[in-house]
Amino acid sequence: MSSSSSGNSRHFGRVAPVVLAILDGWGHREELEHNSIRSAETPIMDALWHAYPHTLIEASGAAVGLPDNQMGNSEVGHLTIGAGRVIRQELVRISETVQTGRLGQTPALIALAERLRKSDGTLHLLGLCSDGGVHSHINHLCGLLHWAAAAGLNKVALHLITDGRDTPTQSASNYLHQIEDAINASGVGELASLCGRYWAMDRDHRWERTIRAYEVLTDPNQSISRVTAEDVLSASYANGTTDEFLEPTRLSNNYFKDGDGLVMFNFRPDRARQLVQSLTLPDFDGFPRANQPSLDVVTFTQYEHDLPVAVAFPAESLDDLLGQVVSEHGLRQYRTAETEKYPHVTYFMNGGIEQPLAGEERHLVPSPRVATYDLAPAMSADTLTESCVKAIESGVYSLVIINYANPDMVGHTGVMGAAQEAISTVDRCIGRLLDSTGRMGGTLLITADHGNAELMQGSDGQAWTAHTTNPVPVILVEGEKRKLSGYGNDIQLRAGGGLADIAPTLLQLLDLPKPDAMSGLTLIQAIESPTPSARLPQPV
């Protein structure tokens, strides 16, 4: 370990920081075809990969507490990085509850069913309808239909948000067929509306999008489509509009009314929050609401602490996280990202805690306000880098964490040229971080939270807009004032690791103890040591 005092290595009287750069969506895939990372100009990352200790780690499936072969995502990735252990994710918790028939034992749903039986109100089921597993899962919706039938709720309206981002761009009809089968099997349910996630799941306060979803759910004067849901999709595709951008469409007269109940079955909070805020907060001011139905609302998980809703699956509390350890040792830390990824380096990395820790400073850089990020592939990366360089060179932060959103957000558009530009932008920014960290004698650790931009087209020839299950890189650039002792002449990063090993690695670089609760293992080892057959820790 370092001979410095508890995490505060200094360079000319200033703290030499440990910097964690998370390249969101930067996965590893050897094949060049349809790979925006391998085909982009990346002189900095290429040079670092060849000159410094590096490895590949797992960022999907069991390595992050998800089912095998389930792609990782930003929420899960940042939670796992911050926890230093594998956490059983909400997808797994809820799926197990549905599969074992225990959904009807959930207190929030029991209470909702009882109130709706008394009031004779309609049960509305709202959420992303796909098997992407990032924000929701169609099996959970099917489970809700069977629960509603068993609970004696016969007035059930389905408001389906179409995906096309974590799934193929024109796959909604497949999910419609599954839902129609579930409606027939359960004997309850009516398709009431369709809406692309572009409108219903914004997270950047683009209220002009959210209001479109709000109105199709609440406005009694909305026109009702004269054609079937399948025909709505076909017409949308014919106009060049894919699932993500599907225009909000009313399919029946089953809109939200006073006394109705609502279950929002998305389990990931960040893209569900705005719509639920608009439906529940009495002092909401994002846009004028012509209709404000009084609803009895249950959300699958906690989207925000102050929402007037019941929560079906409350969060499991976590302690001894990376940020907490740094804070408890009296060290200062800096977290920065642009709007699209700001909750991930703060809220999610801190285990769902919204308030900053003692000594934790946060800096938000606004993302450009464009319809899709292929129109601005550089996003706000340069401004973000400038703010991070200032934090690094301030000499007051022991730990600096920055997230670059470009590979993920531009990768989601499926536009190859734009993704290549995004990758090259991030590569250039890493060069600036490297110079700044080096001037301070600090250490730079580079990794990613999941894959995305390394695959831009699927085998069917359609644009690939989803995440991947590919591993992600880790590169360690050791600083002069952060040299680790006890490793002979040199160090290497072991193979066989996962995202849960990032926090233990950072704590070692900071010369801080790893809590027992962190089952992850440091990636650092001496070159002369045999590579351990590291096992991924099991979910807690």
Curated annotation (Swiss-Prot):
Cofactor requirements of the protein: Mn(2+)
Keywords from the named record: Glycolysis, Isomerase, Manganese, Metal-binding
Entry GO terms, CC: cytosol
Active site per UniProt: 74 (phosphoserine intermediate)
Record-linked Pfam families: iPGM_N, Metalloenzyme
One GO term of the biological process aspect: glycolytic process
Subunit description: Monomer.
Protein name: 2,3-bisphosphoglycerate-independent phosphoglycerate mutase
